[in-house]
């Protein structure tokens, strides 16, 4: 929101925020992208970014890149290991979007909407038993003491989306835009 209204020129965000604005980005479903190399090929060898950006034009956003954040997405659980889909049926998973609900409905698993700031407490109180994320997230947010297991589902790459204000970007003088674009490419190579 801050990028859209011009308070920030560049920001990182989760995929859910942009998926609501771009049907193509929303169509990236779990298990479609099998590795980081696969996502690299999609971003570097296709018009995927250009097509997503065409869908974001009315929202004054440009999707610059995906910043990879760790291992592939899996399932973090409290109290119960998960070895098969049937093991999930007794659990309540933390969700954030309608897409999450659709996935859990297909698995016949219950979901509970919980704000990220409340996940640790929701795990401690039994409001939720699990969430989907890469394993590093439990460490980054101090959930290690309330989670017991990680199941490597390899649902897809874990990434934050790097966006910029379209107005700001298009107003950059050509020499500054060239430097900015080179920085984005350099960041992609380093990531």
What do these predicted ranges mean?
Residues 45:
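Acidic, metal/ion-coordinating pockets
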Residues 1-38, 54-191:
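N-terminal secretory/targeting leader peptides
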